[in-house]
């Protein structure tokens, strides 16, 4: 689970302006951090299917936001996926 300080660090790293918490970059980065955290959780708790449903929902939401960002601004999309290490 992400702590409040972890969330603030992610927001500070990806925000476009001070106080920005809703830009696609910030939302995608927060979802990616939560997804990575849950993936580590599933290595230990393989039978936790209830949380797995939430993980799939987060992955789908991130995919939608990435598609939106790609459609709106391709350069921001490309820089974000390289920073996050998505799409090798």
From Swiss-Prot:
Residues 1-23 are annotated as: Disordered. Residues 1-12 have a biased composition (Polar residues). GO terms for biological process: translation. SMART domains: Ribosomal_S15 (SM01387). Pfam families: Ribosomal_S15. Keywords: Ribonucleoprotein, Ribosomal protein, RNA-binding, rRNA-binding. The keyword Ribosomal protein applies. Disulfide bonds: none annotated. One of its GO terms (molecular function) is structural constituent of ribosome. Signal peptide: none annotated. It comes from the Bacteria. GO terms for cellular component: cytosolic small ribosomal subunit. HAMAP family: Ribosomal_uS15_B (MF_01343_B). Part of the 30S ribosomal subunit. Forms a bridge to the 50S subunit in the 70S ribosome, contacting the 23S rRNA. One of the primary rRNA binding proteins, it binds directly to 16S rRNA where it helps nucleate assembly of the platform of the 30S subunit by binding and bridging several RNA helices of the 16S rRNA. Forms an intersubunit bridge (bridge B4) with the 23S rRNA of the 50S subunit in the ribosome. Belongs to the universal ribosomal protein uS15 family. This is Small ribosomal subunit protein uS15. It comes from Psychrobacter sp. (strain PRwf-1).
């Amino acid at each position: 689970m992400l702590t409040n300080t972890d969330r603030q660090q992610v927001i500070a790293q990806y925000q476009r302006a001070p106080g920005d918490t809703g830009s696609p970059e910030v939302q995608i980065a927060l979802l990616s951090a939560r997804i990575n955290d849950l993936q580590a959780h599933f290595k230990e708790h393989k039978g936790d299917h209830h949380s797995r449903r939430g993980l799939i929902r987060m992955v789908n939401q991130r995919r939608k936001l990435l598609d939106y960002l790609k459609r709106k601004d391709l350069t921001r999309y490309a820089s974000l996926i390289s920073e996050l290490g998505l799409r090798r």
